[in-house]
Amino acid sequence: MAVVVVTDSSASLPAELIGELGIEVVPLHVLVGDTQIREGVDELAVDYAADDVTTSAPSPGELRDAYTEALRRSRGDGVVAVHLSRQLSATWEAGRQAVRDMDAAESVLLVDSLGAGLATGFPVLAAARCAAAGGTLAAVYEAAVRAAAGSRTFFVVNRTEQLRRGGRLSTAASFFGSELVSKPVLQLVQGRLELRDKVRTRSKAFAKLVAAAEEAAGAGPAAVGVQHLAAAEAAETVTSQLRERLPQIAEVHIAEFGPALAVHLGVGAVGVLVLPGGCG
C-alpha cells in the first residue's frame, strides 16, 4: 500500500486534496455552552466572540481509532500524524497518549507542525505527497518535519483579547494588541504566538503582513497560504499583492479559518503562511 498521513481539522486543506492523497482527518471540538461541535462534521452557527465558546482537542481514544484505521489502510507501511502546535493545543499530547496505548511508537510517528491552520496543512501536504510518491515511513516523516521547520506564519487580528482569554497569547502581548494599538501583527515562533509589530490601521497591518511574507519567501520557489475569517476581500487583496511581489510562487492555497481557530482569532483575522521550497 503506502504510508498514510493523519492530521486534525485545523489543517484547513481542501476536500479534493484530502481525498486525492488519502489523508485521514480527525475533527477538533468546539464547545458552545453544553453543546459539542465536531469541526467539519457538525453544523451549528457560532458566535465566536461569546464567553461560553471554547475549544478542545480530540480525545486519545478518537486519535487511537484514527491511527488504527490508518495503519490498517497502510497495510503495514506505517502512519505519520501531523498535528497543530503543542504550544497551542493538547492535540499532539493526546496523540502521543494514543500511540502509547497502541504500543505503536515504531509504526505511528507524530509530528508537531509548530503551527495551526495551513501552517499545519502544508507539512501534511508535503508528507502526503511524499507518501503518494512511494516514500518510506522515515522519508514521509522527514518531509513533514522539514516543512514544519521551514514555514513562516504571520497574522493580523482585530483584537487579541480572544487569544489571551484562550491562553494562546501572553497577557503582555495582548495588552499591546488591545490597548496601545488597533491592529496587532502576530507571528508563530517555534509553535508559539508572539507579537511581531504594532500599527494603527488595518491597511498598515496588511502592508506589514505582505512585507513579512515577502522577506520569508526569499528568492526561490515557495508555497503560500492565505487564511481569513469573514474577510474574503482582504484575503484576496493580500493574495494579489503577494502574487505581484513573489512571481516565483509555486502554489497558493486560500482558505477560511475553521471554527476551532476562529474562536481564538476572531472575525476579520487574516493569516499568511510561507513555505520556501514549496510542499514537495
Each predicted region: which residue ranges?
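N-terminal glycine-rich anion-binding loop in soluble enzyme alpha/beta folds
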Residues: 3-65, 69
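Mixed-charge interfacial surface used for oligomerization/domain docking
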Residues: 4, 10-24, 29-33, 78, ...
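Short gly/ser-rich anion-binding loops that grip negatively charged ligand groups
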Residues: 53-60, 81-92, 113-117, 130
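Active-site cofactor/cluster-binding pocket
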Residues: 61-99
